Amino acid sequence: SIDWEKWYRAYIDVSYDDDANNIHYHYNEDSSNQIRFTEKSHDDVTIPMKIKDSTILPKVKVKYVEKDSFDEFTSGEVTVNSDIVELPNDAPPQ
């Protein structure tokens, strides 16, 4: 779970690349479909994603914004290959 005393916000960043069809898709802070956690949201969140081509596996990482300094920390990236994604050991940062 996230230590909300330390972190202001956490973003889930989802991307996938399909070079053959020149598709590059990316969730980010400025998009309308941004996925964002704050202390008001629950730690256990299910995020539905529909991917048209099941041969393209999305990659997921989490970006944390520190409360005091607004410094950003980005976790390692994992490839989604099942319904449940285990984030790397560096997420959330201590």
Language-model features: where?
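Aromatic/hydrophobic beta-strand junction motif of beta-rich domains
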Residues: 1-2, 49
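Extended low-complexity, serine/threonine- and proline-enriched intrinsically disordered segments
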Residues: 2-31, 62-64
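A compositionally biased, intrinsically disordered/low-complexity signal enriched
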Residues: 7, 14-16, 35-37, 45-47, ...
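Intrinsic disorder/low-complexity signal
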Residues: 12, 17, 28, 52, ...
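Intrinsic-disorder/low-complexity loop/linker signature
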Residues: 20-21, 31-33, 53, 66-73, ...
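Solvent-exposed serine/threonine-rich low-complexity stretches and specific carbohydrate-binding patches
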Residues: 22-41, 78-84
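Short Pro-Gly-centered beta-turn/loop motif in secreted/extracellular proteins
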Residues: 37-70
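Extracellular beta-sheet/turn segments enriched in Thr/Pro/Gly and aliphatic residues
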Residues: 75-94
